[in-house]
Amino acid sequence: MQGAIARVCMVVVAAILNHPLLFPNENTTVPEQDEDLLARMKEHQEKLEAEQKRLEQEISQNETSVIGDQDGYGWYFWSALCLVIFFTIEVCRQDLISAEIPDPAEDEDGDCSTGYHSAKSIALDRGTLNNFCKTRFFPYTNESGRVREFIEGFADDLLEALRSICDLKADLEVEDFAGIGSMFESWRVSKPPTCDLIVPFSPPQPLRFQFELWCDPSTEIPLDLQGCGRIQLIKPGGNGTDCLCGSIDLGDDMLCLLHNRNECEVLEDDALPELLCARDTTYLSKGQIMRWFQISVSKAWGKISHKYDFELAFRNLDFPGALKIKFPSGKTVVLNLTPAVQFENTDAYLISHFPSDTSNSSDTHWQLSLSVYEKNLLKHLAKSLPTNSCHIHCLQIVAFLHKKQTTLTGRSAFCNYHIKTALLHLLLSKRPAMWQPQNLDSRLRDLLSFLQQSLEEKKLYHALVGNPRIPVEILVPKIIRTAEPINLYRPLVLQRHVYAKMEEHFEEMVRNTSVLVQEYTPHFSNGHVRHEFSSAEQI
């Protein structure tokens, strides 16, 4: 018995020691071995395994014949010991192989990323950053307030004129606008000033809108349209629960006690659905709405243009609310009016498009905008931050770098909304004390690193959708708060060349960060900082 056990141990040890990967030659990997040598080694290993199997069968037969013998206990001991030795050597061999044989994928990544710059290692001087912020962004503080006041007054006047030219009986009703974006969140970084306004509209009574969001289990919205929804124009009685006057003909001698005659005429008129909805459907068409909005804005401006001494022009005919105001002095203000539908008496809106996004080509899928909640979240979080916290400066610096990099290498899918989303995630995850003004350089690296990592992982989740960290005071609708998180990069990842361009853009921006900050920081002269902005250039 002991002789058989010894023979088994010798076979096991021989198989391990003769394994070609246990003691590889220095600087030699398996793919580099001669094929014939590998074939012979494999044949030798198969012979050893066959011999081992034969011996095991022999031992098994011997064990059966002497099962009553006390020496059988010794077999179990030696068998367990051999198993432990074999397992230990095998584990050590795997560690040795992992250390000796380089990963081809890692080599490939290393070769491709020879110019890779980690955002965590960017050289940033705290004093230079402070001077940069004081001279680049501080001049906009007071001026932005005046621009907002002017834009709000002008928008009120323009929308009031728009309402006056609309048919109250058979046309969309325009509601009060909501200001969003950098101008209304106090992080403007460049000129000319850009003001973004959401302009909600609603159908005439008794028509109403019904929503089908992507996160509703009863809807069938494609995965590449996450964050979108459809808007259905509903007549009373159209879903079997409302008044039937919208679905049957009452005749001339009958009246509906719930709706007056004008409302009934609206229900009988099929012109409005044809004007607003996609062909052969009851779903709102973005193209139809944008066409209606452009015509209405043009008529409204024609009605009030005599009151103003500036020019108003459409910057982009594809986006009807993309306006440009030009004063006689040459100063300009960019104004984006975006038609939208308010979602069930909340501050969430379904909008026709984002100014920086053209990826959604579906005519009936409207994009969800939570910009009002994001603005409120920034204000809410700022209350718990230290005085003169550095979070806004971090956002401004990265947005400034992005704008300058766009000037150098052209446009990409990367946008300021990605930057703001990353900042909101950091504000929700870091302690308020970490945003002290003296921590500007560290938090700036954190923001750049967060964006860099998100691009590498191809994941940047929406800051509000499905995020349990959002304070309850923000009052995000439950259906959105409990939905699955949305990856903002997903539509871009599906377009490889677009995503590759975005990654290249950001890597160049990280590489140029220190140089751009130094270049656009005014020099000191006689102990004072030289301001490069004149009052005429600030707008």
Swiss-Prot record:
It comes from the Eukaryota. Belongs to the ITPRIP family. The gene is itprip. Residues 1-24 form the signal peptide. PANTHER family: CELL FATE DETERMINING PROTEIN MAB21-RELATED, INOSITOL 1,4,5-TRISPHOSPHATE RECEPTOR-INTERACTING PROTEIN. This is Inositol 1,4,5-trisphosphate receptor-interacting protein. It is found in: Cell membrane; Nucleus outer membrane. Keywords: Cell membrane, Coiled coil, Glycoprotein, Membrane, Nucleus, Signal, Transmembrane, Transmembrane helix. Residues 25-71 are extracellular.
